[in-house]
């Protein structure tokens, strides 16, 4: 049994499984951990040849996948959309947020890697979906997956200001105790709130937005840069596949 979490979009009837491998499944970084990736995908009942991945660069670059072969050169980017049900889009995360999305009418589904630098990638994904499939934001369902949350994510004044001005003032909160102690990271940052604001602003209904509510830095079952250390953290695979329920 491969240690993983399974998430479903709101309503539960959309034909997609959203999967996050856990720390115990082992490292899942593309190119580096190919043997383990093949083992894990096989254990999940997925042919490795169907999986589409990227060289992730903490960007807002989103690709539309037509065939797995289109990505054999490991394009640089952080989001994958597909309309072909044979394709399994996959990114890796460890404190950054996986965002799964699908449309309730258009044949469009995908997964995004959204850390602080890539916050806003959901906008690019929605724009691409509208351009390729004519998919309007109101028909999208979104899952904001496990990531480092404000309980563990403290930032400096510059990053707090950046999120407040570019996304939402509600994405940051001053920790008075840390501030009074003279910490250079006195602000608590909520990637979930920033992305929720982006989804709402784009026109995705609140009832279509699911937040798993889990913190990767708190939960030892997750890979976490903050908890495990930058040189030894576990990349988890976040993937989405078309299924027949």
Language-model regions: role of each:
Residues 1-245:
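Active-site microenvironment for binding and transforming phosphate-containing groups
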